């Protein structure tokens, strides 16, 4: 079961990735985690990536694909894997295909931009503990204060409306075209494509995923 999750930041991919991993026992593969692990382990690919990153350059697709190939060959990926944050662009999707890494399911979490802005800009965090709240969906007992310590909650820079809108702009320009790409792949019989309504309650989305992947 090889899965790609698509959807804008704040569409609920992280929550459902956790559900899929627990339910089906497959690992989540994050390219960021892989890069950090390869650099820490001092592998050949890790050394190349570190040199580029130290120079402030982006790690090229061929290097990332080589890391993904290494990772999916590990024993814990025998039953499948969940790709998170990759591919982000059509050239990356093409490279994945050229590397012979087939994908069984592409799952898109569809949420309107204004809902994402409301979701993310309503988040509040207690910096010391990492506890998070939401002014609408999961409010603290006292507005602006952590339930446990009574200390002030903050809005992370990432959750400010202007930052969220910038991230959405990047998503629509670079990653959104993958929706059409993978729908075409599904029509050609190369994968199965499902669009889920990410505005539903978390449990409802999980139930739908369970049916799709069962």
Curated annotation (Swiss-Prot):
Subunit-structure text:
Monomer.
- Which domain of life does the UniProt lineage start with? Bacteria
Alphabetical keyword list: ATP-binding, Cytoplasm, Kinase, Nucleotide biosynthesis, Nucleotide-binding, Transferase
Q: Record's Gene Ontology CC terms?
A: cytoplasm
Region listing for NMP, in residue ranges: 30-59
Region (LID): which ranges?
122-159
Q: Which PROSITE patterns match?
A: ADENYLATE_KINASE (PS00113)
InterPro entries per the record? Answer: Adenyl_kin_sub (IPR006259), Adenylat/UMP-CMP_kin (IPR000850), Adenylat_kinase_CS (IPR033690), Adenylate_kinase_lid-dom (IPR007862), P-loop_NTPase (IPR027417)
List the subcellular locations: Cytoplasm
* N-terminal signal peptide: none
What the protein does comes down to: Catalyzes the reversible transfer of the terminal phosphate group between ATP and AMP. Plays an important role in cellular energy homeostasis and in adenine nucleotide metabolism.
Q: Name one GO biological process term.
A: AMP salvage
The UniProt similarity line reads: Belongs to the adenylate kinase family.
Any idea which positions bind AMP? 31, 36, 57-59, 85-88, 92, 156, 167
Task: Indicate which residues the UniProt annotation says bind ATP.
Answer: 10-15, 123, 132-133, 200
Name this protein carries in UniProt: Adenylate kinase
What the record says about its domains?
Consists of three domains, a large central CORE domain and two small peripheral domains, NMPbind and LID, which undergo movements during catalysis. The LID domain closes over the site of phosphoryl transfer upon ATP binding. Assembling and dissambling the active center during each catalytic cycle provides an effective means to prevent ATP hydrolysis.
Q: What is its EC number?
A: 2.7.4.3
Q: Which GO terms describe its molecular function?
A: adenylate kinase activity; ATP binding
Main enzyme class: transferase
Q: Which reaction does it catalyse?
A: AMP + ATP = 2 ADP
**Pathway(s) the chain acts in:** Purine metabolism; AMP biosynthesis via salvage pathway; AMP from ADP: step 1/1
